[in-house]
Amino acid sequence: TPKTLYWSPQYLSIAKFIGDSIILPATLKNDSIATCQLGEIAIENKGNGHTQGKVLFRPEQFSLAKKIQDPTASFKGEIKRIESRGRAINICIDICGYELNINEDLINEYHTDEQVTMYLYGKGVFYND
């Protein structure tokens, strides 16, 4: 289905082709957890028995807003840049040395150098390629 193709493609190369992605080197801890630059992350394992690989996220999995559903993980970060995009803003946040760019609605006011909590919703997908 299109949903599966976007959220859980069989191969990382397909994931890169179909939309924006965040890809980080990762080490498989067990069948459902990988460790990457952001820390330990719940994953769907498509590593085919490998323990070294990459974990894929979609940018929309990250948010500064706490939603109705419980987040899978949360991270402390610092806002590095803010770019206005009409009714939304693009925010660059440094989390453990990784600069993550997300789009947020203009509901809240954010400032450069502000310490924030970033929430991850859903799992990453672990690949060996």
Where in the sequence are the language-model features?
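Internal alpha/beta loop-helix hairpins
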Residues: 1-41
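Non-catalytic connector elements of ABC transporters
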Residues: 21-23, 31-129
